[in-house]
């Protein structure tokens, strides 16, 4: 059964949990400097890597998908619109049947591993993605610096390279006028809050994403 069809903890408020880690192969140029040949090498390495560590992951090149299939991944929040719009020979995903594991290949970083669950499941998602990360590091040399941690294309992700987020539905807070107070509290705890369909706007929907901000100088466990 697909993860989004299952009931989750606290799912009257928390619609889903997502944890993502960004990783790059140590001996390959980062995305901004990589040639098409480099990115094809990354793609082939990712295909081999995720085939070896298994987890039922299927390798799919975006270019080989029809537009409806690609768009369905966007609607399930597995990838974003920009990723499928810019698809060429080098972009791909690795995904399992339950769709709770989805790896983006050659988006902003070489590989972006995502784990999903319905409801509030921070510990379970972390345990799964940590297990995946350990297996990746056993098989490949990943770009890492002893001082800074994992190296990523975007400086904001350097360190753990991990983003933890929950998708929440908050219609009551908005109607009672308390939403702004909650937004201020969330930001004090080092997290962002944004409308799922655009930056926070009172005219938008009542569905919000709350991700962490800090990745440098903090452990993965402390982020959770």
Show the residue positions of the predicted features:
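Active-site His/Glu-centered metal-binding helix of metallohydrolases
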Residues: 158
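Long, Pro/Ser/Thr-rich low-complexity/intrinsically disordered regulatory tracts in eukaryotic proteins
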Residues: 1-147, 154, 162, 174-176, ...
């Amino acid at each position: 059964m697909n993860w989004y069809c299952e009931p989750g903890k606290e799912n009257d408020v928390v619609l889903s949990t997502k944890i993502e880690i960004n990783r790059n192969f140590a001996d390959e140029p980062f995305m901004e400097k990589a040639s098409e040949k480099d990115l094809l090498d990354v793609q082939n390495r990712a295909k081999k890597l995720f085939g070896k560590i298994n987890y039922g992951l299927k390798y799919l090149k975006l270019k080989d998908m029809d537009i409806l299939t690609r768009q369905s991944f966007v609607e399930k929040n597995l990838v974003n619109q920009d990723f499928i719009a810019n698809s060429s020979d080098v972009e791909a995903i690795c995904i399992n049947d339950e769709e709770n594991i989805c790896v983006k290949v050659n988006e902003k970083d070489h590989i972006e591993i995502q784990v999903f669950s319905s409801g509030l499941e921070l510990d379970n998602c972390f345990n799964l993605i940590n297990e995946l990360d350990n297996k990746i590091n056993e098989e490949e040399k990943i770009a890492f610096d002893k001082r800074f941690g994992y190296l990523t294309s975007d400086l904001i992700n350097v360190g753990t390279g991990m983003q933890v987020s929950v998708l929440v539905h908050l219609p009551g807070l908005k109607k009672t006028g308390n939403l702004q107070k909650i937004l201020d509290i969330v930001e004090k705890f080092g997290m962002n809050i944004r409308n799922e369909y655009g930056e926070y706007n009172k005219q938008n929907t009542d569905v919000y994403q709350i991700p962490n901000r800090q990745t440098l100088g903090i452990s993965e466990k402390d982020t959770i």
